[in-house]
């Protein structure tokens, strides 16, 4: 595989043209492992299929206070600056698309870019406006020299009327009748619109996929900002998986291999890897119990001590909510529909699915109970820790999948 420039600076913010995007090393092997693990779990049961150096019963979840300390939210501002540099090379292009996978931050990045540039964001149409083919939101683009749409997936429905607006937008923009635009777009929405509407000639950029070494540096800096970094161990191997970012040692190389496994599982996407890191991070049972009791008795949550909370553990990345291999057609089509729309509210399902609202709701409820779906800001979407298995299932059944 071609060596990439990100190796020198370890930056997670390399912005590249879509055709230059490369998944991390061992991505295909990660898919094989996921399939094998699902098969052995089905045959032998979950306990027999897993051998862990540290059992989950010996660990516990971190408090929200501790999580906000060790794993703060991703700051997408550097990505917005990288987008600004890239767009300078497309001064003659009427539209530039920035795409990311689900949970990949495209809306936040483009919103930050708009704020940096002093450009107004175009608000999304309502569900009623989409189903009626309303074009008022397109007209709002035409009245500005520059315009921004942070999340294009909120501006269409896979519905006869629901595609009219985005078709009109692209026709006007590419013909030069609108000002210059920057659009954030879910990678699944992009794949669908490329197929249904056509996006030939539109420059498309994305963040380059990360390798394990880059994830190690990013998470080490995230956890150790302004203080002592924790030692994070793998529950699978018992070995440390975060090395001191100032060291170039054999121990560091071994730790990168473990995070390479996570990078491959997440296809190199920082947003999804961050969710794994936050959701799967644990501390030993009995760690700092007295300190916790004192905090609770005082009724005042405190920031965890970096000195007393140095030992943390990461549960196996592959042990997420997994789709059964015999997932039915209704559930599979629902998952694909949610992905190409970047998530949908319940009342929108009847407009975009070829079966009754009752069937759609039953499938949605079942997937939510399994942990495959989650509700975020009123919309049902594929949960971050289930995304890899959902994508693999859809690809295996020859559904249209995203390019990332």
Residue ranges of predicted features:
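Conserved small helical "lid"/interfacial subdomain of P-loop NTPases
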Residues: 204-255, 264-265
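Conserved P-loop NTPase "ATPase switch" module shared by AAA+ and STAND
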Residues: 122-166, 183-184
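Short amphipathic alpha-helical interaction segments
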Residues: 354-370, 375
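Sensor-1/coupling segment of RecA-like P-loop NTPase cores
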Residues: 153-197, 204-208, 212-215
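Short, amphipathic alpha-helical interaction segments positioned at domain boundaries
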Residues: 387-404
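Winged-helix-like regulatory helical subdomains adjacent to P-loop NTPase cores
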Residues: 279-359
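Extended, compositionally biased accessory segments flanking or bridging domains
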Residues: 1-140
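The conserved phosphate-sensing helix
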Residues: 251-278
